[in-house]
Swiss-Prot record:
<dbReference type="GO" id="GO:0005525">
    <property type="term" value="F:GTP binding"/>
</dbReference>
<dbReference type="Pfam" id="PF03668">
    <property type="entry name" value="RapZ-like_N"/>
</dbReference>
<dbReference type="GO" id="GO:0005524">
    <property type="term" value="F:ATP binding"/>
</dbReference>
<protein>
    <recommendedName>
        <fullName>Nucleotide-binding protein CKL_3564</fullName>
    </recommendedName>
</protein>
<comment type="similarity">
    <text>Belongs to the RapZ-like family.</text>
</comment>
<keyword id="KW-0342">GTP-binding</keyword>
<keyword id="KW-0547">Nucleotide-binding</keyword>
<dbReference type="Pfam" id="PF22740">
    <property type="entry name" value="PapZ_C"/>
</dbReference>
<dbReference type="InterPro" id="IPR053930">
    <property type="entry name" value="RapZ-like_N"/>
</dbReference>
<dbReference type="InterPro" id="IPR053931">
    <property type="entry name" value="RapZ_C"/>
</dbReference>
<comment type="function">
    <text>Displays ATPase and GTPase activities.</text>
</comment>
<feature type="binding site">
    <location>
        <begin position="59"/>
        <end position="62"/>
    </location>
    <ligand>
        <name>GTP</name>
    </ligand>
</feature>
<feature type="binding site">
    <location>
        <begin position="8"/>
        <end position="15"/>
    </location>
    <ligand>
        <name>ATP</name>
    </ligand>
</feature>
<dbReference type="InterPro" id="IPR005337">
    <property type="entry name" value="RapZ-like"/>
</dbReference>
<keyword id="KW-0067">ATP-binding</keyword>
<dbReference type="InterPro" id="IPR027417">
    <property type="entry name" value="P-loop_NTPase"/>
</dbReference>
Amino acid sequence: MRFVIVTGLSGAGKTQAIRNLEDLGFFCVDNLPPTLIPKFAEACYQTDGKIDKIALVIDIRGGQFFDDIFESLNYLQKQGYKYEILFLDASDEVLIKRFKESRRKHPLAPDGRILNGILMERSRLREIKDRSDNIIDTSKLATRELREEITRIYSEEGQMETQLIVTVLSFGFKYGIPVDSDLVFDVRFLPNPFYIPELKNHSGRDKIVVDYIMDFKETVKFIDKLEDMLEFLIPNYLKEGKRQLIVSIGCTGGRHRSVTIANTIYNRLKDNGHRVNIDHRDIEEDIKGGKKL
């Protein structure tokens, strides 16, 4: 099990760090009182590997409870529970600027000068910083750069390259565009099998419909171009930290054209080694002639 305790100065990026760890598959808990760490660790270690990556945010918001952290860490060590400490730091100037931009009050100086709160927090965190396994200074890091550093330290080998999950989703425009779409493609420019009597009651999964749709040169050309576009976009989305991509392909009812095109794109991406899922949102709705809720 990998057990990471995330701490550091207010405004240094702990919230962003915990989000990045969550993207890497960590079970994350924010602002857990330090006195609860031992019981929480014991519960996690008793899951027989069902939970194998844990990240906790412990910071000065815990007030007087924060001072109990060393007793809890010593207990973990005596019990043989391995843990790592990640400390987020930044310069006083950068922290002051971030607090002013966000218009937030420093937790140790709610009615006073931000700098005084920062200096007080530095003093209280000095010992935990000295015990940290990894220290990241975010003063000059953009959000993307912090994410890359977190990934470098805490991802499994090769996870950064395979993290993006693509979902190819077919749908019918008459039932509405999927609200979670990242990319939407309209294939209603292709001839509609609905108006062919022998194809009307079939779906885009059936060979007779697939053969009809794929017989048009426009279909093949569109699929080739869409595949090329996705092969270009996927690594660039990944580089910017995107972890999921929803590619929605729509026709009128989501039963014929969009299903065939979505299946074809799914198979091509899968053959190219991508992590990809397929979902036909409206195929059953259109068969029943119902309305999408």
